[in-house]
Amino acid sequence: MTEVKVKKGESIDKALRRLKRKLDREGTLREARLRKAFEKPCNRRRRKAKEARLKLYSSLY
C-alpha cells in the first residue's frame, strides 16, 4: 500500500499532489482501471502492442 506522510506545516493539497505523483509512477491507478473489467487475452495483446508502438514513436521524436 502506498503511503505519504504529511510533513509538519505542509498543506493537505501538497500531500495529495505527492500521493498522486507517487501512484502515477507506480502505475497503481492505471492498473486498477485496467482490471476493473475483464479484458480478453487477444485484446490485451493488441493493446500492449499499440502502447509499445506509441512509446517507440514518441521516443523517436
Swiss-Prot record:
Q: Which UniProt keywords apply?
A: Ribonucleoprotein, Ribosomal protein
Quick one: a GO cellular component term?
ribonucleoprotein complex
Q: Which Pfam families match?
A: Ribosomal_S21
GO biological process, any: translation
Q: Where is the signal peptide?
A: none
Which domain of life does the protein's organism represent? Bacteria
**GO function term, MF aspect, one:** structural constituent of ribosome
Q: Which NCBIfam families match?
A: S21p (TIGR00030)
* Protein family according to the UniProt entry: Belongs to the bacterial ribosomal protein bS21 family.
What name does this protein carry?
A: Small ribosomal subunit protein bS21
Q: Which organism is it from?
A: Methylacidiphilum infernorum (isolate V4) (Methylokorus infernorum (strain V4))
